[in-house]
C-alpha cells in the first residue's frame, strides 16, 4: 500500500497495486531476474544507485511487514547486513509495527523472486545485497 511520493513511475505503480503479503524485490546488479517477473532496472553504473538507497526510497512508500534475506549475507557481506538490519529497525519504529526478518539460502531466494510483483535492480555490486519486502497493511 502506498504511503508517499516516489518520482519513478514504475516503482510508484507497483507499490500502489500491492495487496497484503505481496512482495517486491530490491536487488544488486547481479541477481538473475526471471523473464516472467516485472523488471525495474535502476542500475546506471557500478554502485549507482546503491542498494540501501533504493531500499530506503521504496520503504518510504511501501508498508512492510516482513523481509527475506539470503543467509549468505551474514558471512559474505556482514557490514551491509548490519546496516540493513538497522534500516529495518528504524522502519519498524516509523511504521509502528514489527517487521519479521527471515533468512533462506541464496538459491531459495532466487526461486522466490519469481513470485514477486516486481524486481527493482540497483547498481549495487557487493555480494548478497538483495531483499524481498513483504507488503503489510496500513490499518
From Swiss-Prot:
**Alphabetized InterPro entries for the sequence:** D-ribose_pyranase, RbsD-like_sf, RbsD_FucU
Which GO terms of type biological process are on file?
D-ribose catabolic process
Per the record, the similarity remark reads: Belongs to the RbsD / FucU family. RbsD subfamily.
Q: Which residues bind substrate?
A: 28, 106, 128-130
What is the catalytic activity of this protein? beta-D-ribopyranose = beta-D-ribofuranose
**Protein name according to UniProt:** D-ribose pyranase
Q: How does it assemble?
A: Homodecamer.
Please list the residues that make up the active site: 20 (proton donor)
GO CC terms, sorted = cytosol
Stated role: Catalyzes the interconversion of beta-pyran and beta-furan forms of D-ribose.
Arranged from A to Z, the UniProt key words for this protein are:
Carbohydrate metabolism, Cytoplasm, Isomerase
> To which pathway does this protein belong?
Carbohydrate metabolism; D-ribose degradation; D-ribose 5-phosphate from beta-D-ribopyranose: step 1/2
Report the locations given in the UniProt record: Cytoplasm
EC number, as in UniProt: 5.4.99.62
Originating gene: rbsD
HAMAP family noted in UniProt: D_rib_pyranase (MF_01661)
**Which Gene Ontology terms cover its molecular function?**
D-ribose pyranase activity; intramolecular lyase activity; monosaccharide binding
Amino acid at each position: 500500500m502506498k504511503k508517499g511520493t516516489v518520482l519513478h513511475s514504475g516503482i510508484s505503480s507497483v507499490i500502489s497495486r500491492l495487496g497484503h503479503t505481496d512482495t517486491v524485490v530490491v536487488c544488486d546488479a547481479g541477481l538473475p531476474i526471471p523473464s516472467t517477473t516485472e523488471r525495474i532496472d535502476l542500475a546506471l553504473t557500478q554502485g549507482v544507485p546503491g542498494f540501501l538507497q533504493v531500499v530506503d526510497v521504496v520503504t518510504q512508500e511501501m508498508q512492510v511487514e516482513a523481509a527475506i534475506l539470503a543467509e549468505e549475507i551474514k558471512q559474505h557481506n556482514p557490514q551491509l547486513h548490519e546496516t540493513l538490519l538497522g534500516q529495518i529497525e528504524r522502519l519498524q519504529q516509523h511504521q509502528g509495527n514489527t517487521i519479521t526478518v527471515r533468512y533462506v539460502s541464496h538459491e531459495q531466494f532466487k526461486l522466490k523472486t519469481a513470485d514477486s510483483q516486481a524486481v527493482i535492480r540497483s547498481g549495487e555490486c557487493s555480494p548478497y545485497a538483495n531483499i524481498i519486502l513483504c507488503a503489510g497493511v496500513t490499518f
